[in-house]
């Protein structure tokens, strides 16, 4: 403890801060120059930003967008699509398993991810099956394309984006167009990730019971 704590505070803390600043700047520049492409790409890499603990570097971008334009095109939309792709992937893993105990546990992880909390699904079912993460990325890209082509906006800044935070995408005027984009992009992310992961599991993890 006498060694680890000072190293964490003095060395790793500043490095993490600098890395977060760089990631935030790169993502902001990417969205400014090519938002249609940026949404699917960033949705696909978002789980790894969460894993590294630097996903919060994107939150100031969302806050700035809300303050200046009244909506956010970056932080919550990419997290929403990514989280749903992770949820769909975990449900595919659960369907693939034969052991009822593990099946039920991982299915609950998938439902939790669909609600916006992905850590149980990511660490409890996906990360030990690296090829399945390809299916997760495919689902995120598919949903992200819709969210990029029909710019998905959120009007409330919050955490843990998922189906439970759909009202974050409701405009102040009550129009439903953006909500439809949120629903369609989210459902596409779940379904495509589920199908892609199911195919990968059948081909690569036949021994997984």
Where are the regions a protein language model picked out?
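Helix-loop-helix junctions within the multi-pass membrane cores of secondary transporters/permeases
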Residues: 62-140
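Transmembrane alpha-helical segments in integral membrane proteins
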Residues: 51-52, 57-64, 87-94, 187-204
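Membrane-interfacial loop-to-helix junctions in multi-pass transporters
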Residues: 27-41, 52, 69-76, 98, ...
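Transmembrane alpha-helical segments and their short flanking loops
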Residues: 36, 100, 108, 120-209
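Core mid-bundle transmembrane helix pairs that form the ion/substrate translocation pathway
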Residues: 1-50
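Membrane-interfacial segments
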Residues: 11, 15, 19, 23, ...
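Alpha-helical membrane-inserting segments
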Residues: 3, 7-12, 49, 88, ...
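Transmembrane alpha-helix interface/packing and boundary motifs in multi-pass membrane proteins
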Residues: 8, 43-55, 66-71, 112-115, ...
């Amino acid at each position: 403890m006498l060694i680890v704590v000072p190293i964490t505070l003095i060395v790793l803390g500043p490095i993490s801060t600098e890395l977060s600043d760089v990631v935030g700047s790169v993502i902001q520049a990417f969205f400014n120059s090519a938002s249609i492409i940026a949404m699917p790409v960033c949705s696909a890499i978002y789980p790894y930003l969460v894993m590294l603990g630097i996903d919060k570097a994107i939150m100031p971008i969302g806050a700035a967008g809300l303050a200046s334009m009244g909506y956010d095109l970056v932080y919550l939309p990419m997290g929403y699509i990514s989280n749903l792709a992770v949820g769909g992937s975990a449900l595919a893993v659960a369907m693939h398993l034969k052991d009822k105990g593990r099946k039920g546990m991982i299915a609950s992880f998938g439902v939790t991810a669909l609600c916006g909390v992905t850590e149980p699904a990511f660490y409890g079912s996906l990360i030990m099956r690296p090829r399945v993460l390809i299916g997760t990325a495919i689902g995120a890209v598919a949903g992200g394309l819709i969210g990029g082509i029909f710019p998905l906006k959120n009007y409330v800044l919050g955490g843990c984006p998922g189906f439970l935070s759909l009202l974050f995408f409701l405009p102040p005027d009550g129009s439903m167009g953006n909500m439809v984009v949120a629903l369609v992009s989210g459902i596409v992310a779940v379904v495509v990730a589920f199908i892609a992961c199911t195919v990968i599991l059948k081909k690569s993890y036949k021994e997984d019971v």
